[in-house]
């Protein structure tokens, strides 16, 4: 048994287990819409939503920003070093139990501090992984995914797999090797690649082709090593257009899918899509989900929301019912997320510094997605949008439209058709009517 040196305290002693009390409840620490065992669309809400807590924002973030110092008040921050790492594990599993969430996710450097050498760092990681494994064995919480932090340490100033320095590439490979071993040890259902610094700031000093080729080589090495050790989790890659680099290589869903297919990686990887990253890319979240879904590569979701008035990754907790409804609509149309889930890659605001704010924030996000699930299920069940779309594209189900779809038409036949049918009649797209219907479903379901 791994012993902590924190005398094991109750980090959330003021909070009872958060329970479902229904929409009329005024209890801020009760679910109004998230009822884990309620069946929606043939599955329980718990299985449809597969909520996950993000270790980094919840247990390591301190509220520091470019303009000010830390603000967060955390009971575990009385410790440091490995004692702090152990206290965070205790606090994490207490929070998981309080919220009754089935999953969590972490970067390697979230859970254990770096040592003076890679060997020492790995030893620190081993201690905490063993501790986490013991907590997992006595709870119902599973690891949704883990990943490697290859962006914080100054060695990654020029990137990791896309670094101009081969020594850095080698170090990054060693770090992901350990990450995959951790994934297998803890039974992670997925392993994520987020290229924090996999991009460039100026082409004046960048060999773009070599960097892309090396990134693909790196990912193929990861696939090969996972096969070697028998790790069978789903590989995921998370797009982001900018920040911290000016041009990230995995800009958005379409760009990332193109990269995966170009290098023969699409049979191994799916996409982990974040709402705020969609905002930064100039897309709606549902756009990114749809692009991945129609390509069969929608894997998991980082559930948050951005501020369209700001140009950076604000990672707010998701409370926008329009966004959660349309996101769940895409997920339901996808048949769910498989081994993926809804991971709250979200942080409380800098001014929400009290420890209980972590609970309020997660309750808000879980309720928002539960509500979105119920509305989306009703929209799918009633075929609200499908019927409109089928009618809108009905000209491709017969006549010249069917010939186009079946590959029987060519420019010669289409020209002759256009000569004979000079009067073109379009129909209204009824966008405002559809938005009104969406409002009605959100308000009434």
UniProtKB/Swiss-Prot annotation:
Source superkingdom: Bacteria
EC number: 5.3.1.5
Active site: 107, 110
Bound cofactor: record note: Binds 2 magnesium ions per subunit.
GO cellular component: cytoplasm
Gene3D superfamilies: Divalent-metal-dependent TIM barrel enzymes
Entry binding sites for Mg(2+) 2: 274, 277, 313, 315
SUPFAM superfamilies hit by this protein: Xylose isomerase-like
GO-annotated molecular function: magnesium ion binding; xylose isomerase activity
GO biological process, one term: D-xylose metabolic process
InterPro entries: Xyl_isomerase-like_sf, Xylose_isom_bac, Xylose_isomerase
Bridged cysteine pairs (disulfide): none
Record keywords: Carbohydrate metabolism, Cytoplasm, Isomerase, Magnesium, Metal-binding, Xylose metabolism
Binding positions (Mg(2+) 1): 238, 274, 302, 345
Cofactor: Mg(2+)
Tagged with keyword Isomerase: yes
Catalysed reactions, semicolon-separated: alpha-D-xylose = alpha-D-xylulofuranose
Subunit structure: Homotetramer.
Family: Belongs to the xylose isomerase family.
Name of protein: Xylose isomerase
Gene (UniProt): xylA
């Amino acid at each position: 048994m791994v012993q902590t040196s924190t005398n094991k305290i109750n980090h959330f002693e003021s909070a009872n287990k958060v329970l479902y009390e229904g929409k009329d409840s005024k209890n801020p620490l009760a679910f109004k819409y998230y009822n884990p065992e309620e069946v929606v669309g043939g599955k329980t809400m718990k299985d449809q939503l597969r909520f996950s807590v993000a270790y980094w924002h919840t247990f390591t973030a301190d509220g520091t920003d470019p303009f000010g110092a830390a603000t967060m008040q955390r009971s575990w921050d009385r410790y440091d070093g490995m004692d702090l790492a152990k206290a965070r594990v205790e606090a994490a599993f207490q929070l998981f139990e309080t919220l009754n969430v089935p999953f969590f996710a972490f970067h390697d450097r979230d859970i254990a501090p770096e040592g003076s050498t890679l060997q020492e760092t790995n030893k620190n990681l081993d201690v905490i992984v063993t501790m986490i494994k013991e907590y997992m064995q006595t709870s119902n919480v599973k690891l949704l995914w883990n990943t490697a932090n290859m962006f914080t340490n100054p060695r990654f100033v020029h990137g990791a797999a896309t670094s101009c320095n081969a020594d850095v590439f080698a170090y990054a490979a060693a770090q992901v090797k350990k990450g995959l071993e951790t994934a297998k040890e803890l039974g992670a259902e997925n392993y994520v690649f987020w290229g924090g610094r996999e991009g460039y700031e100026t082409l004046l000093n960048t060999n773009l082709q070599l960097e892309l080729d090396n990134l693909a080589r790196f990912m193929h090495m990861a696939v090969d090593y996972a096969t070697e050790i028998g790790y069978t989790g789903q590989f995921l890659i998370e797009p982001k257009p900018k920040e911290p680099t000016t041009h990230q290589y995995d800009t958005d869903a379409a760009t990332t899918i193109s990269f995966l297919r170009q290098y023969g990686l699409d049979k191994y990887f799916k996409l982990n899509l974040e709402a705020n990253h969609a905002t930064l890319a100039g897309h709606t979240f549902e756009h990114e989900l749809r692009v991945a879904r129609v390509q069969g590569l929608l894997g998991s979701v980082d559930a948050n929301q951005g501020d369209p008035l700001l140009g950076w990754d604000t990672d707010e907790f998701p409370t926008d019912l329009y966004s959660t409804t349309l996101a769940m609509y895409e997920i339901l149309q996808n048949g769910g997320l498989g081994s993926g889930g809804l991971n709250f890659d979200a942080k409380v605001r800098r001014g929400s510094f009290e420890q209980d704010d972590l609970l309020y924030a997660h309750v808000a996000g879980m309720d928002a997605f539960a509500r979105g699930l119920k509305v989306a299920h009703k929209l799918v069940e009633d075929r609200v949008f499908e019927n409109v779309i089928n009618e809108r594209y009905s000209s491709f189900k017969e006549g010249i439209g069917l010939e186009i779809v079946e590959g029987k038409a060519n420019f010669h036949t289409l020209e002759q058709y256009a000569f004979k049918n000079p009067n073109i009649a379009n129909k209204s797209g009824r966008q405002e009517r559809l938005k009104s219907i969406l409002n009605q479903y959100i308000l009434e379901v």
